[in-house]
UniProtKB/Swiss-Prot annotation:
Superkingdom assignment: Eukaryota
Organism from which the protein derives: Salmo salar (Atlantic salmon)
A GO BP entry: immune system process
Propeptide: 1-16
GO MF entries: threonine-type endopeptidase activity
Subcellular location, record wording: Cytoplasm; Nucleus
GO CC field: cytoplasm; nucleus; proteasome core complex, beta-subunit complex
Upper taxonomic lineage: Eukaryota, Metazoa, Chordata, Craniata, Vertebrata
Protein family (similarity comment): Belongs to the peptidase T1B family.
Subunit and interaction comment: The 26S proteasome consists of a 20S proteasome core and two 19S regulatory subunits. The 20S proteasome core is composed of 28 subunits that are arranged in four stacked rings, resulting in a barrel-shaped structure. The two end rings are each formed by seven alpha subunits, and the two central rings are each formed by seven beta subunits. The catalytic chamber with the active sites is on the inside of the barrel.
A Pfam family reported for this protein in Swiss-Prot or TrEMBL: Proteasome
Protein name: Proteasome subunit beta type-6-B like protein
EC main group: hydrolase
Gene: psmb6l-b
Annotated EC: 3.4.25.1
Coiled coil: none
Length: 217
């Protein structure tokens, strides 16, 4: 399976981070840690929410420069909302991901941010898309990114399975974030998770001291 590693070792305030999105039977879960850092060493915030709602059932999560990511998602939300009004229907997840792709590609010389877009629509159900730094767009059943992803490729490959239940998928995502946050010095804080289905959106926040532990920390 193709996977994309988003390098977040950049100057300025960055979300040296762990982000992921996973489809399950009937929905998709998108998640991240909550730590922001400067230069990969100074922790500037422990409570950044890296999951951005761009439409009712479409979210993206960010890795890289926090300023770049906020600027791109703000522009994307405007374009996606305008598109939805024009079409008189909710936007497709792929359409939202394509907006992010165009913004990243058109500004690839200046931007230092990558994105995962996930959501649910009536045409294709749950979907996950990776938008790379240069604007490349990939559709995948699950993806991981950020500096913490280095530590969980093996876990994700071994434990992911298609058509998981919601509970199995939540456990998979929680364990993956916990493993990455336990090893990566620029991932940490709390685990933010959003469950997206036809019925709606559910937010889950797991404090750092409530995350599963797999080794002495």
């Amino acid at each position: 399976m193709e996977r994309h590693f988003m390098d977040s070792q950049i100057k300025g305030v960055s979300t040296g981070t762990t982000i992921l999105a996973v489809t399950f039977n009937g929905g998709v879960i998108i998640g991240s840690d909550s730590r922001a850092s400067i230069g990969g060493s100074y922790v500037s915030s422990k409570t950044i929410n890296k999951l951005i709602q761009v439409h009712d059932r479409i979210f993206c999560c960010i890795a890289g420069s926090l300023a770049d990511a906020q600027a791109v998602t703000k522009a994307a939300k405007f374009q996606i909302s305008f598109h939805s009004i024009q079409m008189e229907s909710p936007p497709l997840v792929k359409a939202a991901a394509s907006v992010l792709k165009e913004l990243c590609y058109n500004n690839k010389e200046e931007l230092q941010a990558g994105f995962i877009t996930a959501g649910w629509d009536r045409k294709k159900g749950p979907q996950v898309y990776t938008v790379a730094l240069g604007g490349m767009l990939l559709s995948q059943p699950f993806t991981i990114g950020g500096s913490g992803s280095t530590y969980i490729y093996g876990y994700a490959d071994a434990k992911y399975k298609p058509d998981m239940s919601k509970e199995e998928c939540l456990q998979f995502a929680t364990n993956a974030l916990a493993l990455a946050m336990g090893r990566d010095n620029v991932s940490g804080g709390v685990a933010h998770l959003v469950v997206i289905t036809e019925e709606g959106v559910e937010h889950v926040v797991i404090p750092g001291d409530k995350l599963p532990k797999f080794h002495d920390e």
